[in-house]
Amino acid sequence: MSRVGKSPIALQGAEVKLADGSITVKGPLGTITQAVNPLVNVANNDGTLNLSPVDDSREANALSGTMRAIIANMVQGVTKGFERKLTLVGVGYRAQAQGDKLNLSLGFSHPVVHQMPEGIKAETPTQTEIVIKGIDKQKVGQVAAEVRGYRPPEPYKGKGVRYADEVVILKETKKK
């Protein structure tokens, strides 16, 4: 059995509903629904969730660990939430959050407007910082990657959009 799949999930203030083939996690920040793979059994035991593979196959074993990680992220998302911080490095690079849109000035001849998907919010504490928040870890990471993709850090000066914890290794310029 998967080492990850063995450990139980603590439901820290979240409600869980197990329907046929899906799991719904409800917490103070919102609700997330996810389909459960039929090769995985989910059991709710007094504030903890236990997952186990249906049989001893390698696939069921692997999927039990994967489903456990996904459900644990759902519980964390509806109780604490997820956030991803981005920084803009470069002269004139600016960001501004307006409702469900993120306006970016990234050195192009036109401003870049990124539409936020449902359930994801963007904040700009300063003009060169972006904080993307939401309850779905996958969506938060996807939106952060899309915003970074508009102008990834270039290897010579490091200009561009980068994750706050990202280390950009700079190349040396060509010498004669």
Swiss-Prot record:
Function field? This protein binds to the 23S rRNA, and is important in its secondary structure. It is located near the subunit interface in the base of the L7/L12 stalk, and near the tRNA binding site of the peptidyltransferase center.
Cellular component (GO) terms are:
cytosolic large ribosomal subunit
Ion transport as UniProt keyword: no
Q: Does the keyword rRNA-binding apply?
A: yes
Give the keywords, sorted.
Ribonucleoprotein, Ribosomal protein, RNA-binding, rRNA-binding
Q: An example of a Gene Ontology BP annotation on this entry?
A: cytoplasmic translation
Gene name tied to this protein: rplF
- Enumerate the GO terms in the molecular function aspect: rRNA binding; structural constituent of ribosome
Q: Which InterPro entries match?
A: Ribosomal_uL6-like (IPR000702), Ribosomal_uL6-like_a/b-dom_sf (IPR036789), Ribosomal_uL6_a/b-dom (IPR020040), Ribosomal_uL6_bac-type (IPR019906), Ribosomal_uL6_CS (IPR002358)
Q: Which family does it belong to?
A: Belongs to the universal ribosomal protein uL6 family.
Matches recorded under SUPFAM superfamilies: Ribosomal protein L6
NCBIfam families membership: L6_bact
Q: How does it assemble?
A: Part of the 50S ribosomal subunit.
| Protein name listed in UniProt | Large ribosomal subunit protein uL6
